């Protein structure tokens, strides 16, 4: 059952309250490079990013906000550490959300200033706790950044905002340990109704990062926990978007094209791996709620993938196009991709 959380608005995007799970990413261009940041922001929106975050390390970086906002329609999140004045300036510049931990910005007067401005401008705040940011007192209590330590830290930061009647809060608790990550989100889901931003931190390069994120994020979503997500990868941020969307698709939480393909065997008589990769690339920007199959042989292909809306299956130098398990065309191997895309266009 889906955990129903409080709903907040990041710009024009709903987070929580039963809204569809959104996919986020973060700019990795230096904040001093405004032109490059704008270019990457536009590319990430095109790739399907729904909420975009940018590091705002100093006052000069605040200039990024209006420059990026002018070119994209998705909300921009200011990622801020320690300096409460940056949060105030980011709010004035029109961010859709601030990411800041109130316990790290000074005394009550500073927390109150940020809470007041964000409340007036209807800007939510994401509290972002990770295993490297847990307070020393909490670490001493638990001995390590355990799931309970992460949860306690997040609730501590939330209480600082609640003191000043600010409750438009999103919470994330990220660990590089998948097991700790999952347990932390399970605990926080039971102890508050704030929307949860899912992610596994410091997952590594593309291959291992995708594996850890799929398990850490996907297992929580499958149990109804989570309202928005970011897949953190040491890679092109566009890969974060693709992976996040794929996780949602695999769980049936978003529409769009689903690609299935067989693992190949000794009966395969075409370059199925090459064909499957080409089909995947061709489907990248197809906006249809369909399932497409790429199968290796005519013996099992149409039958095994009969639930697919469309598919291809290979033979010796040729292949079949099938629709809902029924063969509709036979074409030479070299024409399989084009023939498949023609049929997809007809749907």
Where in this protein do the model-derived segments appear?
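Active-site mouth loops of central-metabolism enzymes
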Residues: 18-36, 55, 74-82, 138-151, ...
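Catalytic alpha/beta core domains of metabolic enzymes, predominantly
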Residues: 129-130, 138-284
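Hydrophobic or amphipathic alpha-helical targeting/insertion segments
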Residues: 85-126
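N-terminal amphipathic alpha-helix/helix-capping segment at the start of soluble metabolic enzymes
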Residues: 1-26, 119, 281
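Alpha-helix-loop-beta-strand connector modules within alpha/beta enzyme cores
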Residues: 59-80, 113-125, 185-196, 279-281
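Glycine-rich, proline-tolerant flexible connector loops at the mouths of alpha/beta enzymes
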Residues: 33-34, 45-69, 99-107, 169-178
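Hydrophobic faces of well-ordered beta-strands that scaffold small-molecule active sites
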Residues: 21-27, 52-54, 76-80, 98-100, ...
């Amino acid at each position: 059952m889906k955990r129903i959380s409080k709903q907040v608005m990041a710009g024009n995007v709903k987070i929580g309250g039963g809204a569809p799970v959104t996919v986020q990413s973060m700019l990795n261009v230096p904040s001093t490079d405004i032109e490059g940041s704008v270019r990457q922001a536009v590319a990430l929106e095109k790739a399907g990013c729904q909420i975009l975050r940018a590091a705002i390390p100093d006052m000069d970086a605040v200039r990024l906000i209006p420059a990026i906002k002018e070119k994209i329609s998705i909300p921009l999140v200011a990622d801020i550490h320690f300096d409460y004045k940056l949060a105030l300036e980011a709010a004035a510049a029109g961010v859709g959300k601030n990411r800041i931990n109130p316990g790290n910005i000074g005394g009550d007067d500073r927390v109150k200033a940020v809470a007041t401005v964000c409340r007036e401008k209807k800007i939510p705040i994401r509290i972002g706790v990770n295993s490297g940011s847990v307070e020393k007192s909490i670490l001493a209590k638990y001995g390590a950044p355990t799931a309970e330590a992460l949860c306690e830290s997040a609730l501590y930061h939330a209480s600082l905002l609640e003191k000043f009647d600010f409750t438009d809060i999103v919470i994330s608790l990220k660990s590089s340990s998948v097991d700790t990550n999952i347990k932390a989100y399970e605990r926080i889901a039971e102890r508050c109704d704030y929307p949860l931003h899912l992610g596994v931190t410091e997952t590594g390069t593309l291959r291992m990062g995708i594996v850890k994120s799929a398990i850490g994020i996907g297992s929580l979503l499958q149990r109804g926990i989570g309202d928005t997500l970011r897949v953190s990868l040491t890679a092109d941020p566009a890969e974060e978007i693709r992976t996040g969307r794929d996780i949602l698709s695999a769980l049936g939480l978003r529409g769009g094209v689903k690609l299935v393909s067989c693992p190949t065997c000794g009966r395969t008589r075409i370059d199925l791996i090459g064909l499957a990769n080409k089909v995947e690339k061709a489907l990248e920007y197809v906006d249809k709620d369909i399932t497409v199959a790429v199968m290796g042989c005519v013996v099992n292909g149409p039958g095994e993938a009969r639930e697919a809306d469309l598919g291809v299956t290979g033979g010796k130098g040729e292949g079949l196009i099938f629709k809902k398990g029924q063969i509709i065309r036979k074409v030479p191997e070299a024409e399989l991709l084009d023939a498949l895309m023609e049929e997809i266009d007809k749907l």
